């Protein structure tokens, strides 16, 4: 236990929290340009072809972003918005593409959970 004099001379340092999304620089989203759009396979025991994009952000970071939903229109040089949120079975993928923003189209076949995929309300 430190004495009062020791604490006056050198106060206690606050614990530094490590962020899970360093490329966002404490921003909610970031804009970037796709440098490569490809599919990759998940870790065991899952099996699929997950759609991901390599993105060069406006702050200079280059990150891998997951493209959620069925089908997408992204290609190289597409301008997209990314948000935080990792994909548990894809190592190194810590970001998600925001559907329905900038060059990334929404999923037009969505009926439920539409807001997460940038889908408009159907005409019923």
Curated annotation (Swiss-Prot):
PROSITE patterns: RIBOSOMAL_S12 (PS00055). One of its GO terms (cellular component) is small ribosomal subunit. GO terms for molecular function: rRNA binding; structural constituent of ribosome; tRNA binding. Coiled coil: none annotated. InterPro entries: NA-bd_OB-fold, Ribosomal_uS12, Ribosomal_uS12_bac. GO terms for biological process: translation. The keyword Ribosomal protein applies. Keywords: Methylation, Ribonucleoprotein, Ribosomal protein, RNA-binding, rRNA-binding, tRNA-binding. The keyword Ribosomal protein applies. With S4 and S5 plays an important role in translational accuracy. Interacts with and stabilizes bases of the 16S rRNA that are involved in tRNA selection in the A site and with the mRNA backbone. Located at the interface of the 30S and 50S subunits, it traverses the body of the 30S subunit contacting proteins on the other side and probably holding the rRNA structure together. The combined cluster of proteins S8, S12 and S17 appears to hold together the shoulder and platform of the 30S subunit. Belongs to the universal ribosomal protein uS12 family. Part of the 30S ribosomal subunit. Contacts proteins S8 and S17. May interact with IF1 in the 30S initiation complex. NCBIfam families: rpsL_bact (TIGR00981). This is Small ribosomal subunit protein uS12. It comes from Shewanella denitrificans (strain OS217 / ATCC BAA-1090 / DSM 15013).
